A protein has these predicted regions:
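Glycine-rich phosphate-binding loop of ATP-dependent small-molecule kinases
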Residues: 1-194
Length: 194
C-alpha cells in the first residue's frame, strides 16, 4: 500500500523542511505546490505568467488551477509508491477534490500532519527566509496576507481531517530533528495501521 502524507500548517511552520525529510527518509515523491508554481514563473510559462501576480500579492491561486496541477502530478510515475503533499490543499474545495481524486484511485491519505507554530514564530521564520533566500513572495505585506488567508481558508481543513481520523498534531516550535522524530513515529504507526 502506498504511503500518502499531507502536511498542513501556517507558512513558516516548517512544512517544506519536514516534507523533504519525509520524502527522503521514506522514498516518497515530494509534491510542493509552491515550488511547482515558482518554477513555472521562472520558466516563463503560461501558468507562470498567470500565477506570478497572485503569488506576489499573497493571494491564493484559484482552486481549479491548483486541482488540475495536483491531478496531473499525482499521476506521475514517481508518486506511485507514495507522496508527501506540501502546500495543497489550502481550501475546503481543494480538500474535497483531493479526497475525490484519491478515492477514485483507491488511495486514502495515510496520515495528515498539522505542524503547529504560533503566528509570531512563523512570521519571524518567514522574515529570516526572505533575507536568506530573497523570495519575492516573502514581503511583509504578502506574509501578513498569507497568514490571514491561512486562518480563514486553510485552518478549517484541520477539522475536516480530524473527522476523517487521520490527523496528527505536531508541535513545530522545536528543533527540526525533534519534530522529525515525532513525524517518523507517526508515519511508522500509520504504516502498521494500513
Amino acid at each position: 500500500m502506498p504511503l500518502d502524507v499531507l502536511l498542513l500548517g501556517v507558512q513558516g511552520a516548517g512544512k517544506g523542511t519536514q516534507a523533504k525529510r519525509i520524502a527522503s527518509d521514506f522514498g516518497l515523491a515530494h509534491i510542493a505546490t509552491g515550488e511547482m508554481l515558482r518554477d513555472a514563473i521562472a520558466d516563463g510559462s503560461e501558468l507562470g505568467r498567470r500565477v506570478q501576480p497572485i503569488l506576489e500579492s499573497g493571494e491564493l491561486v484559484p482552486d481549479d488551477l491548483m486541482i488540475e496541477l495536483i491531478r496531473e502530478r499525482l499521476q506521475s510515475e514517481d508518486a506511485e509508491n507514495g507522496f508527501v503533499l506540501d502546500g495543497f490543499p489550502r481550501t475546503m474545495p481543494q480538500a474535497e477534490a483531493l479526497d475525490s481524486m484519491l478515492a477514485d484511485i483507491g488511495r486514502p491519505l495515510s496520515v495528515v500532519f498539522e505542524l503547529q507554530v504560533p503566528d509570531d514564530v512563523a512570521v519571524e521564520r518567514l522574515h529570516l527566509r526572505a533575507e536568506q533566500e530573497g523570495r519575492a513572495d516573502d514581503t511583509p505585506e504578502a506574509i501578513e496576507k498569507r497568514l490571514e488567508l491561512y486562518h480563514r481558508e486553510t485552518e478549517p481543513l484541520v477539522g475536516h481531517y480530524r473527522l476523517l481520523g487521520n490527523l496528527v498534531g505536531i508541535h513545530g516550535n522545536r528543533p527540526e530533528n525533534e519534530v522529525f522524530a515525532e513525524i517518523q513515529q507517526a508515519v511508522d504507526q500509520a504504516r502498521v495501521a494500513s
